[in-house]
A protein has these predicted regions:
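N-terminal helix-loop segment corresponding to the beta1-alpha1 unit
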Residues: 1-193, 225, 366, 370-381
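Glycine-rich beta-alpha junction loops
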Residues: 39, 128-129, 201-206, 247-249, ...
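A short glycine-threonine-serine/GTX helix/turn-capping micro-motif
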Residues: 161-172, 194-196, 227-231, 238-240, ...
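Aromatic-enriched alpha-helical interface/lid elements that frame and gate functional surfaces
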Residues: 233-308, 312
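Conserved PLP cofactor-binding pocket of PLP-dependent enzymes
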Residues: 306-330
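Flexible, small-/acidic-enriched active-site or ligand-binding loops
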Residues: 338-381
Length: 381
């Protein structure tokens, strides 16, 4: 049995941050009921990040809402609101990621919900916290990356700000929310008291940069300096980066420069004998290294570096990755199906418990597909 098999989560969240949290709780065995607007559902159903349409809706929605139920309710109507409150009364966890003030207007803020269910863990994600000048701004991932300094850590020195190609702040906030929820559920087991868990996307982005921000303050407030070429980390010296080869790319992490020079047959690198050179002269070193690595194939260099325990790797595209034994041996994919029979392939939960991988064959819910079942449960005496 999965560890959260007896837990009920009522999820009002939209987009990615909140749903990523409820997805992980579902992976761990919780029953997750999405509360959606009648007729249209959550906005994520029509949030297209590509031209891929899955069963008439967004691929994003289907990827992040597998193994959940859908219950439609108009929270502005008293009858529907009362039904939702009955559902909350049975729940262990409630999640939302509306802007500050929305749940207060609906009468579903923490102070009201704790009256309905004193033992509930009430979990919320905001963009910028509940106070401050940015409080009411839209909590969108690219905006958060831009406001928190993340965009100045990727790319080369002349590139300007470069955002990450994934909704990283959404995922970080969702992961932090799950940690808070699980901690409060553990605490509730001894106190039987509910709790309020609050996470903001902006604080999650700051926490993600704890290493860089700590260095910034200790370094006299100097801004991070990306290398001119092959940058992969603003605070690390050469050879750290990704380099083009004859037929692809090679990732190189840490390594003593003279040792690399000997192994690769590049005499020019052997001149950088001081440890400080790796950082102070990293642009020079990377230029020399880049020109040399273009002379051989990726596998040629890997065959030299890997036996010497140099930290390096091929740079795989998804099509190559999915065929590689390193990926297939993990059994990272699973096939899931919606109630109408629509099937799709997606990733599984990355957590193992007692050596067992966590799978679920249940796909994402059609809008309101579980209304009948849930209404029956709520009206049973």
């Amino acid at each position: 049995m999965k560890p959260l098999a007896d837990y009920l989560v009522v999820d009002f969240s939209q987009f990615l941050s909140g749903p990523s949290a409820s997805l992980r709780l579902a992976d761990l065995g919780a029953r997750v009921v999405k509360v959606e607007k009648p007729g249209t559902g959550v906005i994520c159903r029509s949030l297209y990040t590509s031209d891929v349409v899955m069963n008439g809706e967004s691929s994003v929605f289907h990827a992040i809402n597998r193994n959940k139920e859908s219950f439609t309710a108009d929270l502005k109507k008293e009858e529907d609101a009362n039904l939702v409150k009955k559902l909350i009364a049975k729940a262990d966890v409630m999640i939302h990621n509306f802007r500050p003030g929305v749940m207060e207007r609906l009468g579903l803020n923490f102070e009201e919900v704790i009256k309905i269910n004193p033992s509930i863990v009430y979990a919320e994600i905001s963009g910028y916290g509940t106070a401050g000048p940015w409080r009411d701004r839209p909590g969108q991932d690219l905006l958060l990356q831009s406001l928190t300094g993340l965009t100045w850590l990727s790319g080369n020195a002349a590139d300007g700000p470069v955002p990450m190609g994934l909704s990283i702040v959404d995922m970080l906030a969702g992961a932090n929310l799950v940690q808070g929820i699980l901690a409060c559920l553990l605490g509730r087991s001894t106190t039987n008291q509910g709790a309020l868990v609050q996470v903001s996307m902006i604080e999650s982005a700051y926490d993600f940069q704890f290493e860089a921000i700590t260095t910034f303050y200790k370094d006299g407030g100097l801004l991070p300096q990306r290398t001119k070429v092959n940058n992969a980390h603003a605070y690390l010296g050469a050879p750290y980066g990704i380099y083009e080869t004859q037929d692809g790319y090679l990732a190189l992490a840490m390594g003593a420069i003279p040792v690399l020079g000997k192994l690769l047959g590049c005499e020019a690198l052997e001149a950088y004998i001081l440890v400080a050179d790796a950082f102070d002269r990293r642009d020079e070193i990377k230029n020399v290294l880049a020109k040399h690595l273009e002379k051989g194939s990726t596998q040629h260099w890997l065959a030299i570096l890997e036996p010497a325990d140099i930290w390096c790797a091929d740079v795989l595209t998804w099509d190559r990755l999915l065929k590689h034994e390193g990926f297939t041996s993990l059994d990272m994919l699973q096939d899931v199906a919606m109630k109408d029979g629509f099937q799709y392939k997606t990733t599984r939960c990355p957590i193992r418990i007692d050596g067992e991988r966590l799978y679920s064959t249940i796909g994402s819910p059609a809008l309101g597909q579980d209304n009948e079942t849930i209404l029956k449960e709520l009206t049973e005496k």
